[in-house]
Amino acid sequence: MNFYSMPTRRGAQTFFAKSSKEGETFAKALQSALNAEINSKEGGRQYSALCAEKYILECSPYPSAIVECGFLSNYADEINLQKTEYQMRLASVLCGVCKRVLKRRCR
């Protein structure tokens, strides 16, 4: 979850390490699915995956992404993030992308 100074900002956002092309591809796949299944439907917005200098991303030997599932500074996101149904939708989207990525890597 994220907090932003403008309470109108809402939705799920992904981040990747600048040094990882595979991580960037993974984050973009996650973001695309989140845009289609969550962001467009809940807030009418779409976002791009962003490059971030975060320790957990830089030090991972595997393609990695951070997913922020919503903004606590946005009331609608705060309410949604507390609902089991919304959490399950998020989990389903993320799991679906992970399964597709792993399936491609195992070929």
Give residue ranges: language-model regions.
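Active-site-proximal helix/loop segments of hydrolytic enzymes
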Residues: 1-107
